[in-house]
């Protein structure tokens, strides 16, 4: 079976699937307990293991398990095992939480929140032949029907990701004379790209990557911090699910950086792909078009939830376009009416320039797919990268073509993608600077745009993963 992960996470082997208990090659140090003597191991007919001590006592031995954190911190392979993700993050986990809620009084229930990405919404709209607004409302109705309390749109959290990316670029552009690694600034919203960068290029590439959190993880901060305060709950009392176009988002949600040590909870507890939501609809015997629409929920009083919104600049979030427009205005006082993209080798590598009197003031690019990412990294290593900013996405054609999106067996993939792109573009685009509720949250929740609180909740850090040298990784 083909792996659902992005190409950047499948580099070291033709078949990157590993069963962690069989093929994980990371050596584990086992501490010897004081006083432990010689013991025998007995294997039962059912495959279970028992330790027999010298005094005749027996103890069942637990199977070694590889957690998702183990995989993320290991350099033995590029990706994590699909089996780990399936057991820890799936629609079955959501159903368990919803079933558990039904067994207790409302005051003892966990508050279940689902945040839906615009890309997943467009994919579902294509499958059910609906427009994106009806899809959003009917999906809200479905989740409420099965026991979810609140349903949000991650386009709202993307406002913050875009604004922080814009500010970071302007700050780095102004400070490039003092720091050689200030530019180019590379987008950080794609977890497949981040995982590849940490494990393959490490300390060389990481200083170039934007520290702005992705929309998923900003939504994690909004739900587990701001919204939890509004509901007078601690973060661990909220179960937060996101619906994403990409399996790699499961890896992102599992990063230790997004784990609250005080309350022992993640910012995002479970990530469902678009395909898993479709499977959930099938298992519940629900046809999305047959549902009555329900209004979307709003995170704060100033934010409108009448209809879903989106952003200009393509199906991956529009990072290049928003950074370009903001930088042109902020750095050079130029208001860009229309952004003109120039395709280079292929449609997944395009560039944009801002010129004045024949001089190039800004040079930005987008690089989608592993082939283009490789070319970009090689140019950086040779010191021949002409760009100030690059929107990097691991999937060819970007997030609308993510591995978790719905496929149509009776329809060519290119035709389906074009249809999804059209549906995605039907949603009203909103400038993050003008979005209702955003400035209110910067003022009252984050205590300002450049505050310590904004840095902690809207930004993250990256970690180079050192290569482990072990003969166990050799395949003969």
Swiss-Prot record:
One of its GO terms (cellular component) is cytosolic [4Fe-4S] assembly targeting complex. Keywords: 4Fe-4S, Acetylation, Iron, Iron-sulfur, Metal-binding. It holds the Pfam family Fe_hyd_SSU. [4Fe-4S] cluster 2 binds at residues 190, 246, 395, 399. SMART domains: Fe_hyd_SSU (SM00902). One of its GO terms (molecular function) is metal ion binding. It comes from the Eukaryota. The modification N-acetylalanine is found at residue 2. [4Fe-4S] cluster 1 binds at residues 24, 71, 74, 77. One of its GO terms (biological process) is iron-sulfur cluster assembly. Belongs to the NARF family. External component of the CIA complex. In the CIA complex, interacts directly with CIAO1 and MMS19. Component of the cytosolic iron-sulfur protein assembly (CIA) complex, a multiprotein complex that mediates the incorporation of iron-sulfur cluster into extramitochondrial Fe/S proteins. Seems to negatively regulate the level of HIF1A expression, although this effect could be indirect. This is Cytosolic iron-sulfur assembly component 3. It comes from Pongo abelii.
């Amino acid at each position: 079976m083909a792996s659902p992960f992005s190409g950047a996470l499948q580099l070291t082997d033709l078949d990157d699937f590993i069963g962690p208990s069989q093929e994980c090659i990371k050596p584990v140090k086992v501490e010897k307990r004081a006083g432990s003597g010689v013991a025998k191991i007995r294997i039962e007919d059912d495959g279970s293991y028992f330790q027999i001590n010298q005094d005749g006592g027996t103890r069942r031995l637990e199977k070694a398990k590889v957690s998702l954190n183990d995989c993320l911190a290991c350099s033995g392979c590029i990706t994590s095992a699909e089996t780990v993700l399936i057991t820890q993050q799936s629609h079955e986990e959501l159903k368990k939480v919803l079933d558990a809620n039904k067994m207790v009084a409302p005051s003892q229930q966990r508050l279940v929140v689902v945040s839906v990405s615009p890309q997943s919404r467009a994919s579902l709209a294509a499958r059910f032949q609906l427009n994106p607004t009806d899809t959003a409302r009917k999906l809200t109705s479905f989740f409420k029907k099965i026991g979810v309390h609140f349903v949000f749109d991650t386009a709202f959290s993307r406002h913050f990701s875009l604004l922080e990316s814009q500010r970071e670029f302007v700050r780095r552009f102004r400070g490039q004379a003092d720091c050689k690694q200030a530019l180019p600034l590379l987008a950080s919203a794609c977890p497949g790209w981040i995982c590849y960068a940490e494990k393959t290029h490490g300390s060389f590439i990481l200083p170039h990557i934007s520290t702005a959190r992705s929309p998923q993880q900003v939504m994690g901060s909004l739900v587990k911090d701001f919204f939890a305060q509004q509901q007078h709950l601690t973060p661990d009392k909220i179960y937060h699910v996101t619906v994403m176009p990409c399996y790699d988002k499961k890896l992102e949600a599992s990063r230790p950086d997004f784990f609250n040590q005080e309350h022992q909870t993640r910012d995002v507890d479970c990530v469902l792909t678009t395909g898993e939501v479709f499977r959930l609809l099938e298992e519940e015997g629900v046809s999305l078009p047959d549902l009555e629409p329900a209004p979307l929920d709003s995170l704060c009083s100033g934010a409108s939830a009448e209809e879903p919104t989106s952003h200009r600049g393509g199906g991956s979030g529009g990072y290049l376009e928003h950074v370009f427009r903001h930088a042109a205005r902020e750095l050079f006082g130029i208001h860009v009416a229309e952004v003109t993209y120039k395709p280079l080798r292929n449609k997944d590598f395009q560039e944009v320039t801002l010129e004045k009197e024949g001089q190039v003031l800004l040079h930005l690019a987008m690089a989608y797919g592993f082939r283009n990412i490789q070319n970009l990294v090689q140019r950086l290593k040779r010191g021949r990268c002409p760009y100030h900013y690059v929107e990097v996405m691991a999937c060819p054609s970007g997030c609308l073509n993510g591995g978790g999106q719905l496929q149509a067996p009776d329809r060519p993939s290119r035709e389906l993608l074009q249809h999804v792109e059209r549906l995605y573009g039907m949603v009203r685009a909103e400038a993050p600077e003008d979005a209702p509720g955003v400035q209110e949250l910067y003022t009252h929740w984050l205590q300002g745009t450049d505050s310590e609180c904004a840095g902690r909740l809207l930004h993250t850090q990256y970690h180079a993963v050192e290569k482990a040298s072990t003969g166990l990784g050799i395949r003969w």
